[in-house]
């Protein structure tokens, strides 16, 4: 799959990543290579192969759910760059 500089520009804009114009063409080539590799992976016959989430089959110990106070808001927000009324304040990301 071929990716061009215009597609990279559009994806970068959607992801809010500022990329200089001179980097768009090298990024397009790199992304095209990655997508070609993924297409090769899609050609591998995986019929009959069980899906797995880890290479080691283990089970984690279960614990009882316990209700807690949730912590001291002052301690929780101590390292927050910005807080208001016991909440984290973050920049708006949806227009």
UniProtKB/Swiss-Prot annotation:
InterPro entries: Asp/Glu-ADT_sf_sub_c, GatC
EC number: 6.3.5.-
Key word DNA-binding present: no
Reaction(s) the record says it catalyses: L-glutamyl-tRNA(Gln) + L-glutamine + ATP + H2O = L-glutaminyl-tRNA(Gln) + L-glutamate + ADP + phosphate + H(+); L-aspartyl-tRNA(Asn) + L-glutamine + ATP + H2O = L-asparaginyl-tRNA(Asn) + L-glutamate + ADP + phosphate + 2 H(+)
Highest rank taxon of the organism: Bacteria
Keywords: ATP-binding, Ligase, Nucleotide-binding, Protein biosynthesis
GO molecular function: asparaginyl-tRNA synthase (glutamine-hydrolyzing) activity; ATP binding; glutaminyl-tRNA synthase (glutamine-hydrolyzing) activity
Pfam families per the UniProt record, alphabetical: GatC
Keyword Metal-binding carried by entry: no
Function description: Allows the formation of correctly charged Asn-tRNA(Asn) or Gln-tRNA(Gln) through the transamidation of misacylated Asp-tRNA(Asn) or Glu-tRNA(Gln) in organisms which lack either or both of asparaginyl-tRNA or glutaminyl-tRNA synthetases. The reaction takes place in the presence of glutamine and ATP through an activated phospho-Asp-tRNA(Asn) or phospho-Glu-tRNA(Gln).
UniProt subunit comment: Heterotrimer of A, B and C subunits.
Name of the protein: Aspartyl/glutamyl-tRNA(Asn/Gln) amidotransferase subunit C
UniProt source species: Phenylobacterium zucineum (strain HLK1)
Species lineage: Bacteria, Pseudomonadati, Pseudomonadota, Alphaproteobacteria, Caulobacterales
Gene responsible for this protein: gatC
